[in-house]
Amino acid sequence: MQTWLLGLAIVGVTVLVAHLGLRVVRRRVPLPVLETQHEVAGFMIGVLGAIYAVLLAFVVVVVWDQFTESKTNVEKEANQLNDLSRIAQGFSPPAQQHMLDGIRSYIQAVIDDEWPTMSDGKASPRAQAAMEELWHMYREVDPQTNRENALYSEALDRLSDVSDNRRLRINASQDDIPIIVRVLLWGGGLITIAFTYFFGVKSVRSQALMTAALAGVVSFILFIVVALDNPFHGYLRVTPQPMQDVLNRIKTIPTQP
């Protein structure tokens, strides 16, 4: 199911359940009884709502920062691979072609194989093998001139950065909100919505609309939190487009004899 459909379903089901819960309470608890609890319920929902709002805002900020950081790391990795390809063009034709082939193989493995596996929080053995091959290839490079020596030093720095950012990318795909925090988020939302049942509002329709609005907002924010929790899964995900852009540029470099 597409992410936006899942989000719509979650919000719809939550609003429906909240409405049914309100109907059950209003049928079983007389209005005069609810009116006597009005002040206490109002105070409690004010306190609980404030605490829950702070917690929810904190979690949203954390997952959004993690999502943004993951996107930035992917862009850095792509930029460093682009630098590697440009540095490779400064070497002699045989070495240049060997380097470009290795870089191209690594990027292709990341796009075709590692990106799908990261949605499950896993690294790709094919991409790992391509990275190991890149390191092996650069360790075997024998610079022949002062110019190649300088370029070689820069290339090793860039390759080290690529390796580091790949590791950060994989780690980000494995980070999840702890179970205890998930329970607190969903449980807190449920309790906050349930407290709206205990207000002595004469118009059930008006109370139902207020309850539905609160349930819809809370469930939608929780859905956003879940959607952003894994930055490489779902509709709201980091794409490999920066990698694809670099790969497309490398393919335009003329093949050396």
What is each stretch, according to the model?
Residues 3-29, 40, 171-257:
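Alpha-helical transmembrane anchor segments
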Residues 28-40, 76, 154, 158, ...:
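Juxtamembrane loop-helix boundary motifs flanking transmembrane segments in multi-pass membrane proteins
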Residues 38, 59-66, 113-117:
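Short, charged, low-complexity loops and linkers
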Residues 42-59:
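A generic, lipid-embedded transmembrane alpha helix
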Residues 54-75, 229:
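Transmembrane signal-anchor/signal-peptide helices with a preference for the extracytoplasmic
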Residues 73-90, 239-253:
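Short extracytoplasmic/periplasmic juxtamembrane "stem" segments immediately C-terminal to an N-terminal membrane anchor
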Residues 83-174:
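Structured inter-helical modules in multipass membrane proteins
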